[in-house]
């Protein structure tokens, strides 16, 4: 009788991928990157083990929004003090800190558990076209959409 394959830390092979975000839609890009970080693009995917790959996203400042989201979509954070809510539009966040915009979007699609935090640490986002991970010899990854 055959047993279902279960991945563990000893038999996981991780790759490094570079994804160019120039002209890509925020949500579509984020969902594909989240799937790669979780390892769902592999046949060895195991839900309780981190089987995902490392992802480097470049040109985060050239991400694309559909409709009026750049003006209308708001991001909120709170300082835990009375009246401490802060809001910023997606367009302002893209202009000020495009890395945080993409990181928040991708990490929001990962599980809110210790495993999800571990998977989120394999994400590297850069606003420009340069990244310091050339020693890892990352492969270019073409998105499906």
UniProtKB/Swiss-Prot annotation:
Gene Ontology terms: cellular component: cytosolic large ribosomal subunit
Superkingdom: Bacteria
Entry keywords, A to Z: Ribonucleoprotein, Ribosomal protein
GO biological processes: negative regulation of translation; translation
Matches recorded under Gene3D superfamilies: Ribosomal protein L13
Annotated family: Belongs to the universal ribosomal protein uL13 family.
Function: This protein is one of the early assembly proteins of the 50S ribosomal subunit, although it is not seen to bind rRNA by itself. It is important during the early stages of 50S assembly.
Listed name of the protein: Large ribosomal subunit protein uL13
Organism field: Staphylococcus saprophyticus subsp. saprophyticus (strain ATCC 15305 / DSM 20229 / NCIMB 8711 / NCTC 7292 / S-41)
Gene: rplM
């Amino acid at each position: 009788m055959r047993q279902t394959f279960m991945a563990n830390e000893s038999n996981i092979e991780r790759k490094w991928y570079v994804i160019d975000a120039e002209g890509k839609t925020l949500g579509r890009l984020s969902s594909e990157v989240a799937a790669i970080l979780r390892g769902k693009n592999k046949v060895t995917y195991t839900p309780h083990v981190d089987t995902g790959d490392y992802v480097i996203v470049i040109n985060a400042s050239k991400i694309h929004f559909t409709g009026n989201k750049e003006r209308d979509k708001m991001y909120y954070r709170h300082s835990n003090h009375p009246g401490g809510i802060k809001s910023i539009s997606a367009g302002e966040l893209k202009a000020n800190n495009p890395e945080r915009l993409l990181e928040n979007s991708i990490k929001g699609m990962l599980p809110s558990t210790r495993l999800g935090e571990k998977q989120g640490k394999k994400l590297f986002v850069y606003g420009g076209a340069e990244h310091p991970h050339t020693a890892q010899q990352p492969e270019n990854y073409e998105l499906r959409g």
